[in-house]
UniProtKB/Swiss-Prot annotation:
Key words, A-Z: Cytoplasm, Hydrolase, Protease, Serine protease
A GO MF label: serine-type endopeptidase activity
Entry keyword Transcription regulation: no
Family from the record: Belongs to the peptidase S14 family.
Protein name: ATP-dependent Clp protease proteolytic subunit
Subcellular location(s) of the protein: Cytoplasm
Organism superkingdom: Bacteria
UniProt keyword Protease, yes or no: yes
Catalytic center residues: S101, H126
Organism of this sequence: Rippkaea orientalis (strain PCC 8801 / RF-1)
Catalytic activity: Hydrolysis of proteins to small peptides in the presence of ATP and magnesium. alpha-casein is the usual test substrate. In the absence of ATP, only oligopeptides shorter than five residues are hydrolyzed (such as succinyl-Leu-Tyr-|-NHMec, and Leu-Tyr-Leu-|-Tyr-Trp, in which cleavage of the -Tyr-|-Leu- and -Tyr-|-Trp bonds also occurs)
Gene Ontology CC terms: cytoplasm; endopeptidase Clp complex
Assembly and oligomerization: Fourteen ClpP subunits assemble into 2 heptameric rings which stack back to back to give a disk-like structure with a central cavity, resembling the structure of eukaryotic proteasomes.
């Protein structure tokens, strides 16, 4: 039996009455966003909206982005990335479980010094992927050129965020490159491995 979105009790400030709200709404009230699935356009739009709202509500308070994602759409992920860089609030990224592909890119894109992972988290980087299907050769060539351009752009950002050379990033992302939390810290994808909530 599938598990739906859990509801939790919530008491409005100054009220004695509780009401039930979904867990993600409750977390957002604590400035917590949970990226726990594939990055799609719809999910990216919701995360961007949350980031913009929370930043406008109190730009001096940090926003916590928990990540357990296999990755997903590059364009959707770049919308989240650009918004993270645009807003005034610090975005503290925390890997729980797996941050792969675009999930790892977003993890590394948190506020410097505030990119974290739990001890048993796994992080994986690789090059962007695209499909060809049954199409004309010129269309395939156009898509291949765009994927190569995006790959270069992502690699340049990762090199900047991690302190690695562009050549090392290109080599390491040529195939799936898995890291433990400690290895990701040494690589520069995160700043610290945490065991308790001291952030």
């Amino acid at each position: 039996m599938p598990l739906g979105v859990p509801s939790v009790p919530y008491r409005l400030p100054g009220s004695q009455y509780e009401r039930w709200i979904d867990i993600y709404t409750r977390l957002s009230q604590e400035r917590i966003i949970f990226l726990g699935q594939e990055v799609t356009d719809g999910l990216a739009n919701r995360i961007v909206a949350f980031l913009l709202y929370l930043d406008s509500e109190d730009p001096g308070k940090p926003i916590y982005l928990y990540i357990n994602s296999p990755g997903g759409s590059v364009t959707a992920g770049m919308a989240i990335y650009d918004t993270m860089q645009y807003i005034k609030s610090d975005v503290i990224t925390i890997c729980v479980g797996l941050a792969a592909s675009m999930g790892a890119f977003l993890l590394a894109s948190g506020t410097p010094g505030k990119r974290l992972a739990l001890p048993h988290a796994r992080i994986m980087i690789h090059q962007p992927m695209g499909g060809t299907g049954r199409r004309q050769a010129t269309d395939i060539q156009i898509e291949a050129n765009e994927i190569l351009r995006i790959r270069q752009q992502l690699n340049e950002i990762l090199a900047h965020k991690t302190g690695q050379t562009i050549e090392k990033i290109q080599k390491d992302t040529d195939r799936d490159y898995y890291m433990s939390a400690e290895e990701a810290q040494a690589y520069g994808l995160i700043d610290k491995v945490i065991e308790d909530r001291t952030i």
